[in-house]
Curated annotation (Swiss-Prot):
Disruption phenotype: Does not alter the production of ustiloxin B. This is Glutathione hydrolase. One of its GO terms (molecular function) is glutathione hydrolase activity. The keyword Signal applies. It comes from Aspergillus flavus (strain ATCC 200026 / FGSC A1120 / IAM 13836 / NRRL 3357 / JCM 12722 / SRRC 167). Keywords: Acyltransferase, Glycoprotein, Hydrolase, Protease, Signal, Transferase. NCBIfam families: g_glut_trans. Residues 1-41 form the signal peptide. InterPro entries: GGT_lsub_C, GGT_peptidase, GGT_ssub, Ntn_hydrolases_N. Gamma-glutamyltransferase; part of the gene cluster that mediates the biosynthesis of the secondary metabolite ustiloxin B, an antimitotic tetrapeptide. First, ustA is processed by the subtilisin-like endoprotease Kex2 that is outside the ustiloxin B gene cluster, at the C-terminal side of Arg-Lys, after transfer to Golgi apparatus through the endoplasmic reticulum (ER). Cleavage by KEX2 generates 16 peptides YAIG-I to YAIG-XVI. The gene is ustH. Pathway: Mycotoxin biosynthesis. It catalyses: an N-terminal (5-L-glutamyl)-[peptide] + an alpha-amino acid = 5-L-glutamyl amino acid + an N-terminal L-alpha-aminoacyl-[peptide]; glutathione + H2O = L-cysteinylglycine + L-glutamate; an S-substituted glutathione + H2O = an S-substituted L-cysteinylglycine + L-glutamate. Disulfide bonds: none annotated. L-glutamate binds at residues 122, 411, 432, 464-465.
Amino acid sequence: MASKWIEEQPLVHRRDIRISSKSRIAAGLLVLLVLWRYGLPSSIHFGFSSEEPKQLGAVASEHALCSRYGADMLERGGNAADAMVATMFCIGVVGMYHSGIGGGGFMLIKSPDGDFEFVDFRETAPAAIVALGKNTSAGLRSGVPGEVRGLEYLHRKYGVLPWSVVLEPAIRTARDGFLVQEDLVNYIDMAVEETGEDFLSKHPSWAVDFSPSGSRVRLGDTMTRRRLAATLERISVDGPDAFYSGPIAEDMVASLRNVGGIMTLEDLANYTVVTRDTSHIDYRGYQITSTTAPSSGTIAMNILKVLDTYDEFFTPGTTELSTHRMIEAMKFAFGLRTRLGDPSFVHGMEEYENHILSAEMIDHIRQSISDSHTQDTSAYNPDGLEVVNSTGTAHIATVDHQGLAISATTTINRLFGNQIMCDRTGIIMNNEMDDFSVPTSSPPTFGHTPSSTNFAEPGKRPLSAISPAIILHPDGSLFLIAGSAGSNWITTTTVQNIISGIDQNLAAQEILATPRVHHQLIPNHAIFETTYDNGTVDFLSQLGHEVTWYPPAASMAHLIRVNADGGFDPAGDPRLKNSGGVVALQRRKFW
């Protein structure tokens, strides 16, 4: 009965509660009358409790509105799983340029008992997949979406609120509208510039949402996505199966086939999530858990494990040399990444990832790093294999006071996916098939050979840079929920944020504000955010590094740090104008 009551009630925020002055006076007089009549102790406290509200958990994401919705779930008696589902569905509505139900991703979960689970809800190649290439039609670039199944798995195993309750904020936001803010405007402009075409206004299916009055939505406008609201409502009422069969599935298949796609209803009906092994290391005594292939969690762990061998690392006076060592570790790790692929299709992948984290490999890399110079690409990648680049993505972190912690990253790949909007459902389809390596008989980009471990096959999942991580103190208590969005910067950003938290003991917002550097080996140059220290960059140039600059917009991380007193410190990346972390508080009650 309680669940039914919750399901029927609208979300109520504390700001909605209003008590007039007259009502307060009347209530006070009534209480005084009762005290006078029955002689109750005169020392009783009236009004709200003076104690600080209890923290129920926290949420961090690329949009403060969605983080607020996640926190609402915690304040309504839900847990971190409920918060994650509500937040991710919301991000798909307002941050549709990065993610949505037409995509997929990876999720790392720490249960209250301390067990870890890696849930792979990455898109899969359709059964009729053909060789991909530069001229592949848009319809062939979409993989079978996994986000809805991933959230279903999380909710069924860990959630406590009804499914319809956790979807309600996203449905309401899509139906009633949301404010067009700076980040959305920025990504709209980037997508139009990238394609050279204003598809958001000129294509009828996109224009319904993005140009309802004939011109593109602008900063401060209210934007609605009513077709998507109806789709989410169907998923809310009929369950996740409604996405993978029936009218919603038929619309996805038809929309893709109209532009040369091969996805079938059978592909959608057969989609399943996969639970995989996690990767674990110790770093400065902290226990770090991440994911495995086809994600790049093992690569992030390799970088950190190499850097753990240096005693003086980002201590006073060592910043320049520490940055060089970190970049060198990145280059060796990305060389190892060239042989990663979907373990369900690549024989020996588990053994290879164990080798990546073995003492022998770590010692080999450490001995190969010179403090006096960098090296040619062949030293890090002797097989000459290409480095696959991922794009897009949105990262979310949630935690509750019972110890359930989740780090999840979801994506439709490049901005607005493959730029196909399903006509009837408002779903934006992914272009995840572009993350597969492409066989070629001609010299490939940068002169490197495509990796056969990441060639497309029916049902296979492409390699990804996604690297969610959860870090525990040496005593086993929760310290940090980390992860990032933004192409191959995901892996290196996650590493640097962990270093900032552990080695430099920074607060959440300080971690995220720290300038970043990225090196993925191919192309062979270190990319520095324009806010990076010039002296450090000059030092690296003297060691032989090719350096380039990039605005602080390549990677977006959102994380939750747990303070020494057990309080939650969530934060959104300051590189985004509208990101945010929210702490969920127990609602105060009258005595």
